[in-house]
Amino acid sequence: MIHSFVFSEGKLVSRDLELEALRLVHGDKGLILWVDLDQPTEEEIKLILEGVFNFHPLAIEDCVTPSSLPKIEDYEDYLFMVTHAVDFSRTDKFATTELDLFLGKEFLVTFHRSPLRSVATALERITKSTARGPDRLAHTLLDHLVDNYQPVMDELRAELEELEENVLARDSAQQKLVNELLSVRGDFSRLRTIVRPQRDVIDRLARGDSKFIRPLLLPYFRDLRDNLARLEDTAVNYHERLMMAFDIYLNKAAFEANEGIKFLTALTAVTLPAVLVGGWYGMNFEHMPELKSPHGYYYACGLTLLSTLLMVVYLKRKRWF
């Protein structure tokens, strides 16, 4: 689906143009054009990216091919950016969808394979307020994109706190707890993998060495970079807490295993006197004085009970029970 918006002197003057009208507007130096490709078909991709804007083949290839990491490329006439936005339409705890941007002096082209809340919010905002250029539009999009990471962070923090409580609980299901720990660890690893390169992309825009970003917008991009830096620091902190919880779980599991081994060892030690006495009198010798004694059975039972009792007292003092 193709959405298009035309701005003149900061005001929205037209939207959802036909293909030929898009070509004319793109060639008009006095107008600002934003084209949003939302889940486009192959034909729409070719018509817009190649037909209207004539983007570099490598940029188009990077756009249509999913990329796991954010990046930015300068193609002289425009900047090409790969970013990742939170995908709220999926059921995963943390999932992202790629949002690609082509930023020129008088145009902005966005491309995404799934509906994005950040794009929808930006569209609603520009229809109600004044848009002042492609760089301002790009900042608005990226600002909403970064803001949408906060609900994910809050959800992951809540899951982390719940896991920390379950790790210390005595009756927690071990296999389920391990699966949850590994799942949340994967979410945090994914988040850190995305946030750091995305911060580098924004940092390059905030430096002031790009002709596509006006100086008056640099403080806004620097603020965006700082927000991503705080997001990264928070993700690192949560990841460290998660690894600490994982270490506590492993130590707890090892302790519980040792307690089980300790109990079995104590049980073996308690039965050892009976085994020794039974083995002694079970030897196949013809001449054993105790075998002829009328009280031999009682002696053997008494010796067994006394040895067992002494073993129990000893293990009690060692706190094996």
Language model feature labels by segment:
Residues 1-216, 220-223, 227-237, 290-292, ...:
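Peripheral, non-transmembrane regulatory/ligand-interaction domains of membrane transport proteins
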Residues 226-321:
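Hydrophobic alpha-helical transmembrane segments and their immediately adjacent juxtamembrane loops
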